Amino acid sequence: MDYGFATRAIHAGQDPESVTGAVIVPIYQTSTYAQRGVGDHTGYEYSRTDNPTRTALQTCLAALEEAKHALVFASGLGASTTLMLMLKAGDHVICGDDVYGGTYRLFQRVMTEHGLSFDFIDMADPEAVRAAIKPNTRLIWLETPTNPLLKLAPIAAITRVAREHGIWTIVDNTFASPYNQRPITLGADMVLHSTTKYIGGHSDVVGGAIMTSNDELYEKLKFLQNAAGAVPGPFDCWLVLRGVKTLSIRMRDDERNALAIAQFLTEHPGVEKVIYPGLPSHPQHNLAREQMRGFGGMISILLKGGAEAANAMVSKTKL
């Protein structure tokens, strides 16, 4: 049976526990597992490799992104770093020019020291992406909408270009959440999330995730998840499972509030510009309507008066 998004968020990977019938996934707070004999385990042997609470979360997140597989990590950057370990010295990556600051730092300050090269371009035009491809390009890294300027990238068009050249694509879907956008259905090879943000939703846990429907990529990433070890503990996984149950409700309310605030700020005399994909004034509003279910809850604004006005606004903000 095909369940709706909200039902999958509550139930996918979360069947009642077989011994007690508990309807909430237990926190399997263990590092090791008893084996039936030498080399004969029941599916779990060491919690860096696998843990039942983590398995439940991975199953749930894969269902939400309509992917075959998901892997979770100790942070979004832990997921990003693990993914980059699939590349080798001399490989080239194309990335958006408004990528999340932590990702930019990882690429420019860390990965370049290990022989990778990067070009940061405007992802709005698929032909610009095509023009940036080199013989050694191995990965196209999309973030849409971007943090913080809410630029969009046409996922389906760019993934078509990537497939023509045998290049992997990954979409950082953190700002949209799987409720509003599912890049794998648009052709992406992989999707990345900081589960710290919308998926966890309660500001009480740090985590990351990668989803894919490509079996080969999954096996590579699963090996690296275990080998590099940037895995979340079972309590962190449980917190994300708890938070994701209300994702659909939170996203609907968040978008409704964001649109009302964006429309209000558009008319405010102290505001020079409001950037929100849900406004017709956003240069990629039509693309947002095409590839997103909703516009999300993130807004960027440019104030008249520059940094001084921005500092004054932040210092006076009450909520």
UniProtKB/Swiss-Prot annotation:
GO terms for cellular component: cytoplasm. Its cofactor is pyridoxal 5'-phosphate. Keywords: Amino-acid biosynthesis, Cytoplasm, Methionine biosynthesis, Pyridoxal phosphate, Transferase. The keyword Amino-acid biosynthesis applies. InterPro entries: Cys/Met-Metab_PyrdxlP-dep_enz (IPR000277), Cys_met_metab_PP (IPR054542), PyrdxlP-dep_Trfase (IPR015424), PyrdxlP-dep_Trfase_major (IPR015421), PyrdxlP-dep_Trfase_small (IPR015422). Binds 1 pyridoxal phosphate per subunit. Belongs to the trans-sulfuration enzymes family. PANTHER family: CYSTATHIONINE GAMMA-LYASE, TRANS-SULFURATION ENZYME FAMILY MEMBER. This is Probable cystathionine gamma-synthase. The gene is metB.
